């Protein structure tokens, strides 16, 4: 009987050591409270006028001049002189490029102001609302048509005209 108790005692000791060793060798590692932050940076979204703008005449605007100037990446000006009669028209094209590395751009339809609608019609034939420019080089054109719709009789007529296109970032 003593022998039996001795064998049982040895078995219990071996099992206890095995369980104890297993409990000591397991370690759980946790990571808590860490976070990743990605910040919006306006420098990641670059849509601008590209290269030189162009223009064409319609009608017979002899002696007319058009001056196009890009004052910076997002502002351009034009001056049209010498249009004289109904039907004289100038079409101006401003190339737009998306220089963003990873973001696409969605263009809104141009908004136009014209303070002399009696003598001048101004329309934007492009871009259409929702025009999407691919990242890293997608292009579109802002095309403006300025037309004399009534022949001036007694005084020279002028108009102050603006056009704006809003570009929104798209993933």
What are these regions, as identified by a protein language model?
Residues 1-69, 170-171:
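Short, polar/proline-rich extracytoplasmic segments that appear immediately after membrane translocation
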Residues 7, 13, 64, 79, ...:
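Terminal low-complexity, poorly structured segments
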Residues 12, 82-84, 132-136, 153:
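Generic marker of residues within folded, mature protein domains
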Residues 17-18, 25-28, 45-48, 72-126:
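Surface-exposed interaction patch
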Residues 28, 42-44, 53, 100-102, ...:
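Residues that cap or initiate secondary-structure elements
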Residues 45-48, 52-73, 116-137:
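Low-complexity "stalk/linker" and mucin-like segments enriched in Ser/Thr/Pro/Ala/Gly
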Residues 88-108, 135-171:
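C-terminal, structured domain-capping segment
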